[in-house]
Amino acid sequence: SYWGRPHDYLWLGTVHPSLVYQQMSLAYERGIQKMWILNVGDIKPAEYQVELFLDMAWNLEAVKQQGVAAHQRHFLEREFGKNRADRLQPVMQEAYRLAYIRKPEFMGNTRTEEKDPKFKVISDLPWSEQEINERLAAYRQLSDKVEQEWHALPAQKKETYFQLVKYPVQAAAQMNNKLLTAQLARHGKADWADSDRAYDSIVSLTKRYNTTKWNRMMDFQPRRLPVFNRVERKALSSGLPEKRQAVYTWNGADCAEGVSAICEGLGYEGKAVAVSKNKELTFEFTAWETDSVEVEVRLLPNHPVEGERLRFTISLDGSATEAVSYETKGRSEEWKENVLCNQAVRRMVLPVARKASHRLIFTALDEGVVLDQIYLYMPRIK
């Protein structure tokens, strides 16, 4: 959990297990091997991440050989049995992936500890109607699967399941439903009553949490921040943004050539890769219609490992850019945006020749570079 800028996340335990693994493995490799300290404040509902951290601290090599996905599956099998674990693991992996893109606590587009009062007001995320509906559908599918398992569970397992699976997945789904449906409703594209029903569902789920075995353990409104309230009804005359269509998209693992370490499950598509210093990844594409291309590079927004820099270059058909830096300073505006969306983004327009095929080469110039995605766009018309 976290208290502070740009926004708290004290409610649900959505820190991605693969991020815990990537960061702590990196720390161990860099010599932090004598003592790891875990601050256990709000343990519920972060039990799995706590167990993963402690297992890594006790025997990192064993977890490394097992892999994060297998470690999580073992956790679910221990609690719910083999067959149910087979069905639940994809559900939990997708729940972590969706929350990696945007945490439930960040869905109101608000911030904490800012002087400008606008950051206390629920406002639109920069997402198109298509992107909103796709995210709502993904959460709806997860919630339905969780509910199916709930009805099939033996009575002695229901409290554990509610705590570890049902509440965190369905509460996150309803938080997204509450705020994204409200965003659509502000533009006349959804019913405000659906947003209100999502809020009521969170209240009901939390009441269920706090009236049985886990009495008084869960608060769905930490610090009583605006994002946790019922959404105020208001109309906007402006339209929702259109989704910009990329011509080519790759995740880190899509490279045609190169050596990297896949960060199992990490990233917007679960395919981010760690690229060692001076190592290259090659991506190939075919004929391009214009004489230039806009390249958008999306990276894990981590801290520098050596010195104070995080840099890479992009080479298109042998013509390289200068070093591109993406490290940030804590509490800067860019740092806040990176935390909220879990990506550091750099864009550049490069010339492209008229030929049948092209090679785009990504080169890491520092240790600690993790590539998530690369998008190619037709340049914007000025």
Where are the language model's segments positioned?
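Substrate-binding groove of N-acetylhexosamine-processing glycoside hydrolases
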Residues: 1-257
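Extracytoplasmic
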Residues: 222-382
